[in-house]
A protein has these predicted regions:
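Intrinsically disordered, low-complexity linkers and stems that provide flexible hinges
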Residues: 1-55, 62
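Soluble non-cytosolic domains of exported or imported proteins
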Residues: 58-70, 121-126, 130, 145, ...
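Acidic/His/Gly-enriched intrinsically disordered linker/tail segments
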Residues: 146-216, 222, 238, 244-247
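Carboxylate/His-rich catalytic cores and anion/metal-binding grooves
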Residues: 22-27, 75, 83-104, 156-160, ...
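Beta/coil-rich, acidic/histidine-enriched accessory regions frequently appended to metallopeptidases
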Residues: 245-326
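Structural helix-adjacent loops and short alpha-helical linkers that scaffold large soluble proteins
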Residues: 165-174, 225-233, 263-270
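Hydrophobic, well-ordered secondary-structure elements that form the walls
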Residues: 155, 218, 231, 260, ...
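Juxtacatalytic substrate-recognition/specificity segment
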Residues: 40-147
Length: 326
């Protein structure tokens, strides 16, 4: 199949497509843009991003581009580099206050679209985690919506971890954000199991429950892998991204967990999923948090105390170096 665009003078089409389009360009959701603006490739974190800002009045391109670059740099603190060699990132101005809203899509190639307040400033972007979160999604191949607990859980957990590793927030603040997220998920009570809630997340608007219960399972897996002194969840995700982030195959949570557990050398993640996916209760975290010496703090930062696994607590958020160029 050939695709030809006939465009007005000065307008350019921006698509994540390759010269020879894969089947996913037609079978999976994708995004693209038509614009009179130009997009210069951004080399960052060992990869390349084609960054495009759209819309009248959205004239803070350099601030937005710098923010996206920081998000890519932060995500590399997990994967060792940008998890895909090249991706399209589209920033769209919107009438919304607070953090941005984004989506990571795979049809025809990896792409991220982020909707931002059209009046954003460098100061407001400094605390916005959306770019980091969406770029982390690119480290896992496309999964079906019913597996949202896994792909959103991993991204939610590591959004805080990698921002601490990059120095954007302190480890104490990162843990506080995790504790607050876990509490939001716990408070979002449901009569459904996590598995069923994931399948109906959009219909039931149960985002907190699904995102943060999934993040809790990633956290429990991370701590258990470190406690047993084997390979870490970080290293398992790095290996997985290297082989499969850009995969055009159909994946599901069970297959991803099996791959990660092979790298971990033990079924850590699968066991957590089996323990909690078919239950209505939020995953139990109190014992693990006590073993780490982590407790909620009064001023936006968690309180650290002496504990059996304090070294694990510190290692999770320890600074990570920038990646080398590919």
């Amino acid at each position: 199949m050939q695709v030809r665009f006939t465009l007005p003078d000065g307008m350019v089409a921006f698509m994540p497509w390759q010269t020879l389009l894969p089947e996913t360009a037609f079978a999976w959701k994708s995004t693209g843009a038509f614009s009179h603006a130009s997009a210069e490739p951004m080399r960052v974190a060992g990869g390349e991003l084609d960054v495009l800002t759209l819309g009248p009045g959205f004239d803070r391109d350099s601030a937005v581009r710098d923010w996206i670059a920081r998000g890519a740099s932060a995500s590399s603190r997990l994967f060792g580099q940008l998890p895909v060699r090249r991706a399209l990132v589209i920033a769209v101005p919107a009438d919304r206050a607070g953090p941005g809203f984004g989506m990571a899509l795979r049809g025809g190639g990896p792409a991220v679209v982020i909707f931002l307040d059209r009046h954003v400033t460098r100061e407001s972007l400094a605390n916005d985690w959306t770019a980091t979160h969406e770029l982390l999604h690119l480290g896992v191949p496309r999964l079906p919506p019913e597996d949202a607990w896994l792909f959103e859980g991993l991204a939610s957990y590591y959004t805080e971890v990698v921002r601490a590793r990059a120095g954007s927030i302190s480890p104490a603040r990162a843990y506080q954000h995790l504790l607050e997220g876990f509490e939001r998920g716990r408070s979002n009570e449901s009569s459904l199991s996590l598995r069923d809630e994931s399948s109906q997340m959009h219909e039931r608007r149960s985002f907190y429950r699904v995102y943060w219960a999934g993040a809790a399972l990633a956290f429990l897996t991370d701590v258990e892998a470190r406690r047993t002194s084997g390979p870490t969840l970080d290293s398992a995700l790095q290996a997985f991204a290297a082989c499969c982030a850009a995969s055009e195959e159909d994946w599901n949570a069970e297959r991803v967990l099996a791959h990660l557990d092979r790298s971990l050398g033990a079924p850590h993640f699968t066991e957590q999923a089996r323990r909690w996916l078919d239950r209505r209760e939020f995953p139990a975290l109190d014992g693990v948090l006590r073993s780490l010496g982590v407790a909620p703090g009064p001023r936006g930062e968690a309180i650290f105390g002496p504990a059996l696994n304090a070294a694990i607590r510190d290692a999770i958020m320890a600074p990570a170096p920038l990646p080398a160029a590919r």
